[in-house]
Amino acid sequence: MSVSNKLGDLASKVYENVLLEEVKKYPRPRHIGIITDGNRRYARNVGISENEGHVKGKEKVEEVVDWCMELDIRIVTFYAFSTENFRRSPEEVDFLFHLIDNAFKSLLKDERVYKNRINVKVIGNLSILPAYLRQTIHIVEETTKNFNNYQLNLAIGYGGREEILDAIKRITRDAMDGKLNIDELDEEKFRMYLYDGRIPDPDLILRTSGEERISNFLLWQSAYSELYFSDVYWPEFSKLDFLRAIYSYQRRQRRFGR
């Protein structure tokens, strides 16, 4: 590494530490939703396989969870696998499901989960996932269900429109069965028909890769979320990039439609 590169890295680290201390002075978001975009484009850019790009993306999720805990951000939701992702090749989908399955099994052995009492929850249409993955998800959720310091949500087999449509179907069935008075339905009752209505709405939604859209992610829940778009691909997303997103959020005035 050249002297200029070393100096650049040193300056970046100093700036990161300064920004970290600045961010700690102000209220942080309670809940962040993250659209982890750009694994495949990253892989093509650096000359590795797309599967290796997905592995790098999985490792980045683990890093970001640590960053969230460092800032006492209590809830984070990662958009891990959308319903649209089923359109990819069967080979890629199969690889992703096994990667996710192995990641969950690693969580069961990760002392950070137990030390920090991280509740792990999956949101999505689990019926469309492979049986082996559903079983692993069940074990992880059962193991961590009483942990309440932090919450790690993974949106898998998830689509925002599908979530709302599924909620409407369940509401219709309950109304027809006499379990629900449709005239008493309000936003709070409606949200309890979502995949997990207990999860607070995200304060901030962050997307990597330079794309500026939310791509069917938490459509109901993001009505008043702040949005932040980062130009870097997900595996390259650095702690400095993360701090910049939080700092940007802290400089905004949330109006909630007022």
UniProtKB/Swiss-Prot annotation:
Enzyme Commission number(s) of this protein: 2.5.1.89
Catalysed reaction equations from the record: geranylgeranyl diphosphate + 7 isopentenyl diphosphate = tri-trans,hepta-cis-undecaprenyl diphosphate + 7 diphosphate
Keywords noted in UniProt: Magnesium, Metal-binding, Transferase
Residues involved in substrate binding: 38-41, 54, 82-84, 86, 88, 207, 213-215
Cofactor note text: Binds 2 magnesium ions per subunit.
Gene Ontology MF term list: ditrans,polycis-polyprenyl diphosphate synthase [(2E,6E)-farnesyl diphosphate specific] activity; magnesium ion binding
Biological processes per GO annotation: polyprenol biosynthetic process
Cofactor(s) the protein needs: Mg(2+)
Keyword Protein biosynthesis: no
Binding residues annotated for Mg(2+), in chain numbering: 37, 226
Active-site residues from the entry: 37, 85
CDD domains from the UniProt entry: Cis_IPPS
Top-level taxon of the source organism: Archaea
Keyword rRNA-binding: no
A Pfam family per the record: Prenyltransf
Subunit structure: Homodimer.
Purpose of the protein: Catalyzes the sequential condensation of isopentenyl diphosphate (IPP) with geranylgeranyl diphosphate (GGPP) to yield (2Z,6Z,10Z,14Z,18Z,22Z,26Z,30E,34E,38E)-undecaprenyl diphosphate (tritrans,heptacis-UPP). It is probably the precursor of glycosyl carrier lipids.
Family: Belongs to the UPP synthase family.
Name listed for the protein in its UniProt record: Tritrans,polycis-undecaprenyl-diphosphate synthase (geranylgeranyl-diphosphate specific)
UniProt organism field: Thermoplasma acidophilum (strain ATCC 25905 / DSM 1728 / JCM 9062 / NBRC 15155 / AMRC-C165)
Lineage: Archaea, Methanobacteriati, Thermoplasmatota, Thermoplasmata, Thermoplasmatales
Gene from which this protein is expressed: uppS
